[in-house]
Amino acid sequence: MELKKLEKFVDEIKEKIRRLKEQYYAGKTEVESELRKVQKELKTKVKEFFKDLTPWDRVQLARHPKRPHTKDYIERIFNNFQELHGDRFCGDDPSIVAGIGYFYGKPVAVIGHEKGRDTKERMKRNFGMPNPEGYKKANRVMKLAEKFRFPVVTFVDTPGAFPGIEAEEHNQSKAIADSIYTMAYLKVPTVSVIIGEGGSGGALALAVADRVFMLQNSVYSVISPEGCAAILWKDQKAVEKAAEALKLTAQDLLQLGVIDGIIPEPYGAAHIDPLSTARVVKYCLRKTLNELTKRDISSLLEERIQKYSSMGVFEIAPTIEKYD
């Protein structure tokens, strides 16, 4: 079953479930058995479809137009979120949303990439590709959180930092480097969740956290499969091979020790049930922040520095001399 056919099937079944629930709550308890049967059918079909996904399949799911974005998670997880604008240097970049909200009654700083939904909003938000002003804004909010001792939660969903001429003129590389440096040494607990695409340094700028989680069908890589295929194979048709070679899935990155955990997506994909996905993310954040906020900040900072300093470290095997 193709993804579009599956989504059509899911929509039809969900509508059927909605009607059966209305009847059940109206007092027609005889529909309970049929309701359970339909719900089971939905779970079985979806589970069967998503059980053997290739890395390229997961890339396509990570980019799905209906996949929940940062603003969706903010709306469903945090209370009284107040967005902050501007980098206090040049301007504001809508491709990064940043502000202060309440999580179970306690203030937290929330920062994330935002791609937008329709064409107009996507153009406004530059398709989730931040300019230097976006990273400077994120940097400002991180330092604000540190000043008032708020934990920092980030949501990563970007194909990468914007590679335009103006972005380079405004020192894109330094803006990313400053964000990475600030996040590495923040004296507050930090949690990052990769919710869609995690593209190169543009993603890393918001992902140097104490704990990094990935949604089941998100991806995180130094380059897109298309870019990798063009460079290594000189062929756009090699995207599937490139996706496999890049080890960009949550499963691969957990095994490699790059991330700390995988957040399951209900019904196999976040866009099929965004509300349930937000609930799972909320539970993960609550559990993680409860753990981190109890820790001494000096030991947490030391652990964070050690974690990222040790990535990519390797040993060269000693030379074995040959004897006649």
Task: Show which residues each predicted segment covers.
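Short hinge/gating elements
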Residues: V59-A62, M123-F127, G268-H271
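Short active-site-adjacent helix-start/loop capping segments
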Residues: P68-T70, D118-K120, F162-G164
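Glycine-rich beta-alpha loop segments
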Residues: K51, C90-D92, A98, Y104-F155, ...
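Short coil/turn segments at secondary-structure boundaries
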Residues: P65-H69, N126-M129, A167
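Terminal peptide-recognition signature
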Residues: I13, T54, V110, D157, ...
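Conserved catalytic cores of soluble enzyme domains
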Residues: V156-R286, N290, K294
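Short, motif-level signal for alpha-helix interfacial/capping segments enriched in acidic residues
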Residues: V31-E34, G134-K136, C228
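Intrinsically disordered, low-complexity segments enriched in small/flexible residues
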Residues: M1-P107, L275, R279-D324
